[in-house]
Amino acid sequence: MKKDIISGQTGVAASAAVVAFCDVDDSLITTTRVSPCEGAEPCAVDDKGLVCGYLSPKQRVLNQLLAASAQVVLTTARSSKGLKNVQLPVSSGAYAIVSFGGVILTPAGCPEPRWHQRMSEESGQYAALLDELCAHIKDVAAEKNIDVRVRVVVDAGLPLYVSVKHNQKNLFELCTIKAAAESFLQEHHPAAARQQMFTHFNGNFLAFLPPFLRKEYAVRWFMENVAAPGALSIGLGDSESDLAFMSLCDYVLMPSRSQAFAGLRR
């Protein structure tokens, strides 16, 4: 029987020895409504069916390389529903960590029951706070005439975090919303603020995460409970917030034009 070069074990596929935790937007794909370069192919749509993501030729090579050599675990802020709107070479029949780690999807597309039970217990403690924060942001946006979409993201029946996106991609006004929301938390929910309510802000995406919700928590649990023992791990991401889960891995990979890489160079 042929001995696998990467795993070093007879009859063991290379993908069993390597697990790659990969962010999706602006890592495996380019999030844009306009083709980013010649040869790019549409690979993602929004809820209205309009193209919102492309796969560049180099990203296609990266996707194919990962699919051929690793167990790929998509690790994304996208919800379960949002991930279904993305078509990638690595996404078929794979595990996925979605909604900032709030849900781990099995290859069958169902929530991993052990992790889901844990998140169900945690999320129930913060449901009212998320609703209150969402309502406050809507009030601030209306008062200041800021055109944003605000919602509590619910995935697999669990209220997980508050998402804010500007309809004209006005980052200055998003910063205004960010400051108002953080001030509200400090004043009205100081305990939650001290427990590290986390603000994710990258491009036109602003999100407020309760203390239990982090990609790195789900990645660590996956490593301990699902991944093959001793597997080589790779972390791929583009946001500064991705560095936390990437740092759990043996090797780190990021786009050279990304928030994460720019932060490391500062």
Regions from the language model: what does each represent?
Residues 4-20, 24-72, 80-84:
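Active-site neighborhood of HAD-like aspartate-dependent phosphohydrolases
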Residues 54-142:
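Active-site phosphate-binding/coordination module
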Residues 82-85, 218, 244-245, 263:
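Phosphate- and divalent-cation-binding pockets in alpha/beta enzyme and binding domains
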Residues 136-234, 240-248:
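Conserved acidic, metal-coordinating active-site core of Asp-based
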Residues 248-266:
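Asp-based, Mg2+/Mn2+-dependent phosphohydrolase catalytic module
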Residues 72, 96, 233, 252-253:
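Short, well-ordered beta-strand core segments
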Residues 18-20, 94, 233:
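The start of beta-strands in P-loop NTPase/AAA+ ATPase cores
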Residues 22-34, 99-101, 107-109, 155-157, ...:
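Short loop/turn segments at strand-loop or loop-helix junctions that form parts
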